């Protein structure tokens, strides 16, 4: 039977404490999802905490699968350079493959996106295919699987039909 339990964290050092997460496993088999999702994040943000911290956390988790989902915010950048974006993605995916060598790596491309702003819509139309191509190429180069979520939604502009049906 499920019981309610209380978790208390106390600082024993007297300094600033930053809790990055908690691992509360039941001991029963199942799927553990550990997300570092940040609303508005871009691909470069995954490197911000520092590689050594990421390596330690991935080592403790010992994941069977690492899923990386980026591109939706990146494609809204007016200064996006596809070659630099692909190089950054390739570097990050290469590091993840090294940091979790036993894990399969899955990269999901961005969902189709639209904007009420004409300027942003033009920017997305220009950047979306480049971001998807860069992520696909970087994933393949890192030995990762790639899923094109925009194609699964129905392709370019499909988000509008999803929105009309109140699905997006």
Model-predicted segments: where are they?
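Conserved SGNH/GDSL esterase-like catalytic core that processes O-acyl groups on lipids
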Residues: 1-94, 114-116, 165-167
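Residues that form or immediately flank small-molecule/cofactor binding pockets and catalytic motifs
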Residues: 27, 38, 110, 151-154
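Alpha/beta-hydrolase-fold catalytic nucleophile elbow
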Residues: 69, 108-109
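Alpha-helical scaffolding segments of alpha/beta enzyme cores, especially the outer helices
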Residues: 84-87, 91-98, 130-137
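Secondary-structure boundary motif
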Residues: 98, 102, 154-155
